[in-house]
Every structure is written in structure tokens, then in C-alpha cells.
Amino acid sequence: MPSNIHSVAKVHRVACIPGDGIGVDITEAATRVLNTLSTVLKTFEFDFTTFDWSSKAYLERGWYMPPDGLDQLKKYDVIYFGAVGWPDVPDHISLWSLILPIRKALNQYVNVRPTSILPGTKSPLADCKREDLDWVIVRENSEGEYSGQGGISHEHSEHAVATEVSIFTQVGIERIMRFAFDTARSRPRKKLTMVTKSNAQRHGMVLWDKVFYQVAKDYPDVSTDKMLVDAMTVRMVLHPTSLDTIVATNLHADILSDLAAALSGSIGIAPSSNLDPTRKNPSMFEPIHGSAPDIAGKGIANPIGAFWSAAEMVRWLGETEAADGLMKAISNVTAAGVKTKDLGGSEDTKGVTNAVCKEIEKLFGGGE
């Protein structure tokens, strides 16, 4: 615990779960940036507690979270998550033993994934300017295709049968649609695109569509349109300026947000927020990239997605000035050409982190 914690106005308790691979690298970088932010501003403090709920620990002891893990997390204001996944553990085990239970048990039914092109970076799309790509993807985060229902019968025979059941509920759909409409209403263009596959999936997705249009009646100031998910990938590539706020199911948004990140320059810059809008449980913030075992521990991971996620966390905590300042620092650093290799630069994780910390001190502390 920081030694000066008693002297500040506010203390934000943060549960840190670095996880696996570069999750460890970028979480270390993010906590350093956050501590710099609080030190310079002097209006709040972070109290970080790190939980070793990694795949390495799982292989040693047989579990990711302890039985009371979710209860432990509920004691914190927010959760900062690095990444999960390691070659020695099947992906479905690592996901369903850690991040998915957290999202579900803590009612984090909204996943927000903003996408934009940062200064000094460029999209792989020809002639795509910064102002041409400015999206927010709102992902249903608690049910749908990731409901976890199903099973495998006759698994060890030649006649194995597997089911993966998607569950869509009226309540679940309506609450994500209202959040998406509120998000669209808060943005200048007031435009919401709903993604579906109701032409082929004739039950759950038909209900998805129906609830969308019902909720739309309460938002006459928000313009709407509907896209089949396959056609949506084409539109994102060919007509990025036609999009603004996007709402999609758990699976569809998971895929589309990775495409969005790539179109903005690199998946390494993309943030996400797992929110409980009721604020009865801590929300969780994480970059959308994976654990990247091939570059883990090499000090070359792009920390921008981690910093952007940290900025979203700070904003959620009510520290608007700090969040805006952190985003300004990130933008100034990328504009100056301080970037990792995936963005066309030559810096490593530490170099970008140093630059962002220095920029924070310059913006808030008057440093040169």
C-alpha cells in the first residue's frame, strides 16, 4: 500500500489480475502510468492488489481463482485485467475458469470497445483518415453465444455429439440495447447500427431484432440501421465513415471488435470495459489483445491498449480530468512517433511507457 495513502482525498482500490504472457508486461506498464497520474495530480490514490490467477499457477495448483475469488473481487472498486491464455492449458479451460466467470458473476453485462486511429498512426485502409474511423462497439457480455450451455455426448466414441446453445433473453437483450442507444445518443452523430444474423438464426436473433426495434421507439433522436454480421465486415472495410455506434451479440462483437482494432492500426491499441452499469459490482478493464506467448517477457508488447483501458477505468471511477489527460498523453506520444513495431515504430514497452509517464508529468506537473 502506498505510504502516502492517508493524505489524499480519495483512494481507489484496484484488483490487478495480470494473467498470462504479455498480460504481465502490460499490467506492470499500466500500473506505473496510473501511479504517475495519481502522483502528479495529487487528488486521488490507487491501492493496487495483485492476484496471481495465471495459467502457470493453475498448472501448479489446479485452479485459477480460489473458491472465494469472486467474493474477494467484490471488495474492490474496479478490476484491471491483463490477458489470459497459455499453450499448456486448453483455451476453453482458461477462459471459463477466469475471465468469463468474472464477467457473469459480477453482472458485467456490457462490454464497450471504442475504436479510433491515434495521431501518428495510420489505418491499413487506403485513404482512411483519422476522422473517418471513430466507432464504439457495444457488446452483449453475459449471454448469447457464450452462455456456456451445452455438452458433448459419446465423447470418446466415433459418434460424438456436441451442442453449444445460445441463450437470448428479453431482459438481457433490452438492457444492452438501452445501453447502446444511450451511448449513441451521447455521441455527436446519434447513430446506432444493430448487427444480427436473423436471416439464418430464426429464434434468438429474431428476438434480438424485435427488442431492438421496440427499444428504438424510446429514442426517436437516434438514427438506426440493421446489418447482417457478414455484410457488416464488408461495410467496416469499404465504408468506415458510415458507422458510429454499433451493438452486437457476444460472439459477433467479439469478432467485429478485433477487425475494428486491426483497421485502426493494431490490435495492440484497443481497449475494452466490462461494465456493471448498476455499479453494484466492480467493473473490469482490459486491452482486447491476447496473451501473445511468442513475445511474452521480451519487453516489446504494445502497451497502448493497456493505457487506453486504464484511462477508461479512471473515467469510470469519476476522475474525468485524469482520464482526459491520460488520453492526451497517449495521443501526444504516438503523434511524436514513439511507437512499438506493430504501429511502425521502433520503441519497446518500456520506451513507450517512459514517454507516456513523461508526457503526463508535462501536462499536469509543468515538466519539460
Model-predicted regions and their roles:
Residues 15-31, 157-229:
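Glycine-rich phosphate/diphosphate-binding loop of Rossmann-like nucleotide-binding domains
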Residues 42-47, 187-196, 219-227, 319-327, ...:
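Flexible, glycine/charged-enriched surface loops at secondary-structure junctions
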Residues 20-23, 77, 138, 180, ...:
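Buried hydrophobic positions in well-ordered alpha/beta secondary-structure cores of metabolic enzymes
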Residues 57, 235-336:
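Glycine-rich phosphate/nucleotide-binding loop
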Residues 13-22, 80-85, 192-198, 308-315:
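Short glycine-rich or small-residue beta-strand-to-loop segments that form or flank ligand, phosphate
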Residues 58-163, 251-253:
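N-terminal glycine-rich phosphate/adenylate-binding segment common to multiple enzyme folds
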Residues 2-49:
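N-terminal phosphate-binding or glycine-rich loops at protein starts, especially the Walker A/P-loop
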